[in-house]
Regions:
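An anion-binding catalytic pocket shared by soluble metabolic enzymes
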Residues: 41
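Short alpha-helix carrying the canonical HExxH Zn2+-binding catalytic motif
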Residues: 55-66
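Auxiliary, metal-adjacent structural segments of Zn-dependent hydrolase domains
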Residues: 1-33, 38
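His/Glu-rich zincin catalytic helix
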Residues: 28, 47, 67
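Catalytic Zn2+-binding segment of zinc metalloproteases
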Residues: 64-74
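Short pre-active-site segment immediately N-terminal to the catalytic Zn-binding motif
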Residues: 2-4, 45-57
């Protein structure tokens, strides 16, 4: 059985975020989430209150941001 294209995109984005040194957390945030740094650590929070499509958009936007900052290769 082949993996759904949306899940492939999700997995690729999360892998890229992790490779950039971010800890990925999936939490119920009521509409929040994204990249942040505190306590000397880097985090990506994915809001489980959002739909998979919204979470995917959030993750892919984080990847774009990391690419713009040079933390992920193109």
């Amino acid at each position: 059985m082949e993996t759904d294209p949306i899940l492939k995109r999700w997995n690729a984005a999360i892998e890229a975020i992790r490779e950039a040194g971010y800890i990925v957390r999936e939490e119920w945030l009521e509409g929040g989430g994204g990249l942040c740094e505190f306590g000397g650590k880097k985090y990506f929070f994915s809001d489980q209150a959002l739909s998979l499509f919204e979470r995917l958009d959030q993750a892919e936007e984080a990847v774009k941001t990391l690419k713009m900052k040079g933390k992920i290769d193109e």
